[in-house]
């Protein structure tokens, strides 16, 4: 073998010329103890609160407790591979997630990493997870409707764009069903391709079973709703820090649409589980417990999240972010700590009851306890025209329902009231996955409050409604179009509608 001195020296010269003197500088600390998703780290003197840190093997964590001699870090992942003495690096960045339209149709984890096997995400940019809510000046009062396609909600508890409306009830009362229907209902605006009316949806699943999340994704895909939806999943098997951060991550993704003049809807399903995850983290970090062992700042945990939902003024692009948080109660106890907190933060609540659900009244909305504090300003005039009287009649019916058992002894006026109430209650029932267009809801409720159902057997109300709507679509679509475009029932439209209903009632059998 021949040794060429000239060649060797040329290679050595080249190596020396390209030798980089710049060493990689990182501030590091050492793990003192680890367990239950929490690591105590010594060092990291300059770490910021909420900063991302990196453990060996690429596992990320977030610095939450900054104490005199150590830092309490919550671990976003499996802590079994982290051991005492491991080196922890500062990343210099606060926790952030990808945002943009590239996320639509995807399922991501709490840190924005795709978990649906469809390849990497093309994000517009990355934004911080925990940012301040918009101030008072850039906001505008809620004035545009956010249609859910559910008669009971759109008529009695209307929701506007930029509103925060709580959905509260025991387990298995149909909370998620209402929310999934709301997402599916937005398809009609996406199909119409009206950019101003489109509503992008974000569904944040916190602490739910993986099978449940998979089922929801499948349902949304089947109905073509995944095209405008992002699903953020932090399931029950994920560590508490990921369940805690997921709602904020989803909210940041929604804020991208709000701040770019678009409209978004975010669903947190559910915040009780986020509060439980936060309680677990806080207790393990040895923060002092308060009522029901929740930490003292659990109110702030939810208020800073829900205050980020807003309707922006014209100067700020006129976008909006509507929030529908979910709270699960135990035995219909609305006066527990977390439910009362969230009720006081939101602009109203939809209260679902087990008893109604088992009676077959679905959606099981308790109309008496449910309110919408700002939604009436967003309701279209046509719905206001018919919904005013249905509220009153249902309230009177609930008051009188206690006497319904002694129906034979009641005067005709009360009997009539009870009969009307029973039919209106039947009219507000709606099967799952069949949201209605606003103009159809208006016609359906109009028929109820104007007495067209009074002579019909209660069991036939559903059939009457479906026949009426299919008949009106085929024979008098101009009535539907008039209500949809004018957003009110004008005198001419009402005349046509009355004539149509009179004729239809005679033929219905």
From Swiss-Prot:
The principal localisation class reads membrane
**Positions in coiled-coil regions:** none
This enzyme catalyses: ATP + H2O + 4 H(+)(in) = ADP + phosphate + 5 H(+)(out)
Q: Which UniProt keywords apply?
A: ATP synthesis, ATP-binding, Cell inner membrane, Cell membrane, CF(1), Hydrogen ion transport, Ion transport, Membrane, Nucleotide-binding, Translocase, Transport
What Pfam families has UniProt attached to this entry? ATP-synt_ab, ATP-synt_ab_C, ATP-synt_ab_N
Among CDD domains, the record links this protein to: ATP-synt_F1_alpha_C, ATP-synt_F1_alpha_N, F1-ATPase_alpha_CD
Residue numbers for the site described as Required for activity? Answer: 370
The enzyme's E.C. designation: 7.1.2.2
* List of residues binding ATP: 169-176
**Locations listed in the record:** Cell inner membrane
Look up keyword Ion transport and say if it applies: yes
The molecular function terms in GO held by this entry are: ADP binding; ATP binding; proton-transporting ATP synthase activity, rotational mechanism
Q: What's a single GO CC term here? A: proton-transporting ATP synthase complex
| Bilayer disposition of the protein | Peripheral membrane protein
Q: Which PROSITE patterns match?
A: ATPASE_ALPHA_BETA (PS00152)
According to its UniProt entry, what is the function of this protein? Answer: Produces ATP from ADP in the presence of a proton gradient across the membrane. The alpha chain is a regulatory subunit.
| UniProt similarity note | Belongs to the ATPase alpha/beta chains family.
Name the UniProt record assigns to this protein: ATP synthase subunit alpha
Lineage start = Bacteria, Pseudomonadati, Pseudomonadota, Alphaproteobacteria, Rhodospirillales
